[in-house]
C-alpha cells in the first residue's frame, strides 16, 4: 500500500510500537527519517537506530526507549504540518508546553528542534511535536 505522508507513517509506526511495548520497529529508509531518528536519539526519546541495507529495500530499525515502569519514553507524538495544510513558523517560534516537549522543524539547515531553531534565528516547517 503506497504511503502519501511518509512522516505521518514514521510517527505512527513509532507510536504503535510503543503502545504495543515492542522493543524495535522497522521503518522504510529515507535521509529525512534517518535525520529525525538521529535527533530523537540525541534528545533521549529513543535508544538507538540502525540503517539496514542488506534487504532489497533499505530500512531503519529503531530501538525504542522505555521508563523503569515499562511505559514508553514518548508520551505523545503528533503530526503538525500535513500534506493538505502545511504549517510554517518563523524565527519567533513558541515553546511547546512551556518547554516540556519539542517541536521538530525542517529548516534550510536541516532537521532541528524548536530550541535549536530559536538559537540560530531561523524558522521552518513544523513536522511534528513530541512529549
From Swiss-Prot:
Keyword rRNA-binding attached: yes
Keyword Acetylation: no
Signal peptide location: none
GO cellular component, one term: ribonucleoprotein complex
GO molecular function: rRNA binding; structural constituent of ribosome
SUPFAM superfamilies registered for this protein in UniProt: Ribosomal protein S8
Keyword set, alphabetical order: Ribonucleoprotein, Ribosomal protein, RNA-binding, rRNA-binding
InterPro entries: Ribosomal_uS8 (IPR000630), Ribosomal_uS8_CS (IPR047863), Ribosomal_uS8_sf (IPR035987)
BP GO terms, sorted: translation
Domain of life of the native organism: Bacteria
Subunit relationships: Part of the 30S ribosomal subunit. Contacts proteins S5 and S12.
Function comment: One of the primary rRNA binding proteins, it binds directly to 16S rRNA central domain where it helps coordinate assembly of the platform of the 30S subunit.
Family statement drawn from the similarity comment of this UniProt entry: Belongs to the universal ribosomal protein uS8 family.
The name this protein goes by in its record: Small ribosomal subunit protein uS8
Gene: rpsH
